[in-house]
Each structure stands twice: as C-alpha cells, then as structure tokens.
Design a protein with these regions (language model features):
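Bacterial N-terminal signal peptides that target proteins for export
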Residues: 1-8
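Low-complexity, intrinsically disordered regions enriched in charged/polar residues
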Residues: 9-10, 51
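Cleavable N-terminal signal peptides
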Residues: 10-11, 20-21
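N-terminal signal peptide c-region/cleavage motif recognized by signal peptidases
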Residues: 16-18
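Compact, glycine-rich, soluble single-domain proteins
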Residues: 22-148
Length: 148
C-alpha cells in the first residue's frame, strides 16, 4: 500500500471516529403494538437531528436483538435510506405521524446504494437488526405506542 493510500485510509478512519465520538445518541424505551396486538419493547437510540440521522448505524457491526435506532423528524415526508457504510443487514420500518406502520424493507443489503423509501409520508423510521420484523411480527396494523 502506498503512503498516499495509507494516509487517506488513516484520515477516513479518524474522520469516522470523530463523528461517532462526538455523536450522542439518547437511548430510550420504545413500545410497539405489533400485528397481533402484542406489546413489544425495544431499546432504541434516538436520531432526531440532522447530524445523528446522517450517522445512523454507519460502521456498526454489533447490533443486539431487541435494540435499534429510531429516526424522528418534525414533519411527515417521503423518507429515503441507503446502506452506504453500514456493514449490518437491517430491517427498516416506516411509520406515519400517528405511529402507524406504513411499510418495511427487510434484510437490507450491507453497503448497498439502493434507495429504500417509505411508500407514504413518514415521520418515524425504525431500524432493527435483519429478521426482527418477522420475529416480532412488525407489519400491517403495528403501531408505535410510546417512547420513554
């Protein structure tokens, strides 16, 4: 590896580390009523500003089951995601302003640049480790109940 390439790689690693070290995700408990009206609890990191939303799960390889990231906006709009710099396969679940399920993209492809979009305007987006939607039955009629 040339010294130029090594320098560039070092810079990228340092840059990503500095982003993560300065990012402070607040952890909260999320309560969802699933498709069978059963209550499911998740510990989520809240991404409620541009900086945190831009980081998401980028670079993370260890996402324990029952944990996730909840993206929150002040308004409803069509939301777009991609998996660039995200090494873990995820389920990405979109909810409307009232917390009702819109759609889910299951088992996303790590590092993919494919567009993952809500089918309707969304205010909340939940990212969980791949397979969680199926395991916890998070489909039609699922609803966010509470975030503490």
């Amino acid at each position: 590896m040339s010294s130029k390439s090594l320098f560039l790689l070092s810079f990228i690693v340092f840059f990503l580390y500095s982003l993560y070290s300065s990012a402070e995700f607040l952890k909260k408990e999320l309560l969802i009523s699933n498709s069978d009206n059963q209550l499911k609890y998740f510990i989520v990191e809240v991404a409620d500003n541009d900086k945190l939303r831009s980081l998401g799960f980028m670079g993370r390889t260890d996402i324990p089951e029952g944990t996730g990231m909840l993206f929150i906006w002040n308004d409803e709009a069509y939301r777009n995601f991609w998996m660039k710099n995200t090494p873990s396969s995820l389920d990405i679940i979109f909810f409307d302003k009232n917390g009702y399920f819109i759609n889910v993209q299951e088992n996303t492809i790590p590092f993919s640049l494919d567009n993952i979009q809500s089918l309707k305007p969304s205010k909340y987006v939940l990212e969980l480790i791949a397979g969680s939607s199926k395991k916890f039955n998070l489909y039609n009629h699922s609803r966010i109940i509470n975030l503490n």
